[in-house]
Amino acid sequence: MVSSNFYKNLGPRKLTAIVDFLHDIIEPTKIYEDIDIYDIKILQEASPNDISFLSNPKYSEFLKTTKAAACIVPKNFTEEVNQNTVLIHAENSYFAYSKLIDFFYAPIKSYSTKIMKSAIIADSATIGKNCYIGHNVVIEDDVIIGDNSIIDAGTFIGRGVNIGKNARIEQHVSINYAIIGDDVVILVGAKIGQDGFGFSTEKGVHHKIFHIGIVKIGNNVEIGSNTTIDRGALQDTIIEDLCRIDNLVQIGHGVKIGKGSIIVAQAGIAGSSAIGKYCALGGQVGIAGHLNIGDGTQVAAQGGVAQNIEEGKIVGGSPAVPIMDWHRQSIIMKQLVKTSNSKLKK
C-alpha cells in the first residue's frame, strides 16, 4: 500500500488515457474500455479498479488469479490469464511500469524557489534561477550552481565546485573539488571529492600523498546514498554521462567509469582502474587497482576482478573467471563437499 503521507495519488485515470500516455512504448491490440483506474498495484494485491504489470516470469502464475482490471505484459506473452483482466502488451513492460508511476503519483514534498535563512552562502558564489537551497546548507566561495537545482538540508559544497542545471542534491551530502554536469541526482549522505587512499611508504612510515586531481561527473548521473567518490591524486576521477551508482559504493582515486555503466551496492573500485562503457558490476564486486575493464563487461555479484577484462565478457567468482567456468567450479565444489561428507560418515 502506497502511503499518502509521502505520495499523492493523481488518480483515477481512464484506461484509454493510460494507453494514450504509453502509446509510444506499448502495442495496442484492441479498443480499450473507458473505465476508471485508481491505482497501480502488484498482481497479488490488485483490485478490480487497479492496473498491474508483469516483467518477471516468476510471477506469471498470479495472472490467473489477479483481480486487476488491466495488466501490462511483455510483447510476446501468451499464457492463460484471468478473463476479466485486460492485457496491454509492451516491448519492455518494466519500463512501461516505470513511466506509469509518474502518471499516477507525485511526491507530497515539493520544493519552492527559495533560499532558507539558515543557509550560509559565500558572497562570491553564483546561484542560478529557480533554485531551492535548504536549511543549514553551506556553499563556499566561487561555487556555481545551475538553474532549477535543489540543494537540500545540511549539504556542504566546497570552494570552487561547479554544479550544472536541474541538479537534485539531497540531505547531508558533501561535495569538494568537483565539476558536476546537468540533471544529476545525488542521494542522502554521499561524499564526493575527498582525498583518496594514497600513501608512499618509507622506512615503515606511511606518508600521505597530496591529491591534486578532482572529480568530474557527467550529465544525467545518479549517485546513491552514502557512496564515496575520491578525487584523483594526479589524474581526475571521472564518472561519464548516464551512469547509475547504487548506495554504499566506494570509487577510488583516479578511477574512470564509462558512459551508461551501472554499479550495484557495496561494490568497490580501487584507484586508477578504468571501467568501460555500459558495464554492469553486481553487488559487492571488487575491482583491483590499475585495471582496464572493457566496454559491456558484466561482473556477477561478489566477483573479485584481479586482471584486465576484454569487452563484452561476463565473469563471476573470486578471482573472476568466465561465467560458465564459474558455474562449473561451483558444481564441482558442491560435488566435492558431498563426496567428502559421505567419506566422513563412513
Swiss-Prot record:
GO CC field: membrane
InterPro entries noted in UniProt: Hexapep, Hexapep_transf_CS, LpxD, Trimer_LpxA-like_sf, UDP_GlcNAc_AcTrfase_non-rep
Alphabetical list of Gene3D superfamilies matching this protein: Hexapeptide repeat proteins, MurE/MurF, N-terminal domain
Entry GO MF terms: N-acyltransferase activity
PROSITE patterns documented for this protein: HEXAPEP_TRANSFERASES
Catalytic activity, as annotated: a UDP-3-O-[(3R)-3-hydroxyacyl]-alpha-D-glucosamine + a (3R)-hydroxyacyl-[ACP] = a UDP-2-N,3-O-bis[(3R)-3-hydroxyacyl]-alpha-D-glucosamine + holo-[ACP] + H(+)
Signal sequence extent: none
EC code: 2.3.1.191
Keywords attached to this entry: Acyltransferase, Lipid A biosynthesis, Lipid biosynthesis, Lipid metabolism, Repeat, Transferase
Top-level taxon in the UniProt lineage: Bacteria
Keyword Transmembrane helix: no
Example of a GO biological process term: lipid A biosynthetic process
Annotated catalytic residues: 253
Pathway: Bacterial outer membrane biogenesis; LPS lipid A biosynthesis
Cited function: Catalyzes the N-acylation of UDP-3-O-acylglucosamine using 3-hydroxyacyl-ACP as the acyl donor. Is involved in the biosynthesis of lipid A, a phosphorylated glycolipid that anchors the lipopolysaccharide to the outer membrane of the cell.
Protein family membership: Belongs to the transferase hexapeptide repeat family. LpxD subfamily.
PANTHER family xrefs: UDP-3-O-ACYLGLUCOSAMINE N-ACYLTRANSFERASE, UDP-3-O-ACYLGLUCOSAMINE N-ACYLTRANSFERASE 1, MITOCHONDRIAL-RELATED
The protein's assembly and partners: Homotrimer.
Protein name: UDP-3-O-acylglucosamine N-acyltransferase
Organism in which the protein naturally occurs: Rickettsia prowazekii (strain Madrid E)
Phylogenetic lineage: Bacteria, Pseudomonadati, Pseudomonadota, Alphaproteobacteria, Rickettsiales
